[in-house]
Amino acid sequence: MLSGLIQRFEEEKMKHNQDRVEEPSQVRVDDTISQPPRYAPSAPMPSSMPTVALEILDKAMSNTTGATQTQKAEKAAFASYAGVARDDVRLRQIKRHVNEQILPKLKSDLSGLKKKRAIIHTTLLVAAVVALLTSVCTLSSDMSVAFKINGTKTEVPSWFKSLNPMLGVVNLGATFLMMVCAKSERALNQQIDMIKKEVMKKQSYNDAVRMSFTEFSSIPLDGLEMPLT
């Protein structure tokens, strides 16, 4: 019985070894084993445009807020160039075409506001002259100032003094008109400055889109070297 068990154990061992030898032969010859790449793996290089945009914005915001309109226009131009560096090619072209449609309307509005401001400023000057003259006339008659004409003193006639109430009303109206014109002119100046800033931003954006990469930088940047027309 013991010899039978030993023989059976030997048979099972031989069968097991034979199965292990036959397993590699079942692999197909035409199957290719995956090999690692022969080059060092590398991820795609990140775009440099966000860095350029941040550098441009840093340049625009390095100083204090622009005190003059020229400085404000300069910062608006820097912001537009930063926007071009941040946007992709398709968005740049969409914004460019929209800006080309809006710019003539903005310039027309700007011209109209300038004409309106000129009219209001002229009205302000006329009202200031009227207020000054009426103030002098009223003050002279109230103080009974005497004028020397050809060596003789001439006082303000009584009929002129009777005009003081009317001159006071005219002076009050001229002063009120001056205040209204000054307030309107300040509001127009703010609108004109805002439109000028928008015109500068849109023109700068379009100029940046049209700019070739050789003008923008010696290193090709994303999309700037091939502006679409």
Curated annotation (Swiss-Prot):
InterPro entries named among the record's database cross-references: Orbi_NS3 (IPR002565)
* Organism of provenance: Bluetongue virus 11 (isolate USA)
Q: Which Pfam families match?
A: Orbi_NS3
Sum up the protein's function in the record's words: Plays a role in the inhibition of host innate immune response. Interacts with host OPTN and thus inhibits the recruitment of TBK1 to the host Golgi apparatus. In turn, downstream partner IRF3 cannot be activated and IFN-beta production is impaired.
Gene label:
Segment-10
List keywords of the entry alphabetically: Host cell membrane, Host Golgi apparatus, Host membrane, Host-virus interaction, Inhibition of host innate immune response by virus, Membrane, Transmembrane, Transmembrane helix, Viral immunoevasion
A GO cellular component annotated for this chain's UniProt record is:
membrane
Name-wise, this protein is Non-structural protein P8
Q: What residue ranges are annotated as transmembrane?
A: 119-139, 162-182
- Ranges for the region named Disordered are 13-46
- Where does the protein end up? Host cell membrane; Host Golgi apparatus
Topology relative to the membrane: Multi-pass membrane protein
The entry describes its oligomerization and partners as: Forms homooligomers via coiled-coil motif. Interacts with host OPTN; this interaction inhibits innate immune response.
